[in-house]
Amino acid sequence: MKKIIRFIKNYWVTGLLFLGLYFTYVYLSNNDNVNKLLFPPVDQIIKAFGDVNLTFFDNMLGSFGLMIPSLIIALIIALALGTIMGLSPFCRRVLYPIIYTVSVVPSILLSPFALVLAPNFKLASIFLIAYNIIWPTLFATINGIITIDRVYLDIADTLEIKGVKRLFKVLYPAAMPSIFSGLVTSIRGTFLILVFAEMYGTQLGMGYFVKKYTDYGMYDYAWAGLLFMIFILLIVMLAFEKAKERTLRWTINDK
């Protein structure tokens, strides 16, 4: 009961904002001056949900089939390279100019090259999504390691903590707030590339679902797909935020 009361106290304003958005849409859909095709009535969207609810989950799995491998690949590369650069001033001097140059290139601009060079569209999509995830996480890892308080390192030296144990017991925990911040930023931007990839080259995925029914002019189904996609992406972001809070509970004070 206390959790429910606390939830209401924290999010009642958010709930009012969502209600405001809902009633704004209801007003638009009932207004004769608004295109009924683009803004179908709410009951029509609800009916569309019922008609294609099983298809939603197939498309969700298709999206995760692209997102999860991309995330794993990007994390491995970002953590490995970020750790090396964070620990080695020489590597930072040599690689920083190259990384800054490459990282400013939007992944969407690389899509023609990825489509031509990759053996299939799925690998091209995974490359583009992973490319988009790597940079914020990489820079956050580097900054997290080079800004570690010297006290932690001195204590590790005193306790003779070295090698892999030093990495996982001292460096990564101390740098984790920065790493998580970069990762969450990466994931937010990744949804844009994920939807772009699905809209213009796959036959499965949440972005593909919305694009397909938009092309057909069935905007009630497109709205249903868009709302479902927003709901799923919101759950993913909340899950990462919860994982972040749990991992960094020793640094977070929300009281």
Regions found by a protein language model. Name each.
Residues 141-179:
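Short cytoplasmic-facing helical segments at TM-TM junctions of multi-pass membrane proteins
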Residues 100-136, 143-144:
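Generic hydrophobic transmembrane alpha-helix motif, especially the helices
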Residues 146, 181, 223-255:
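C-terminal transmembrane helix and the adjacent membrane-cytosol boundary/short C-terminal tail
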Residues 6, 30-72:
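Periplasmic/extracellular loop-to-transmembrane helix junction in inner-membrane transport proteins
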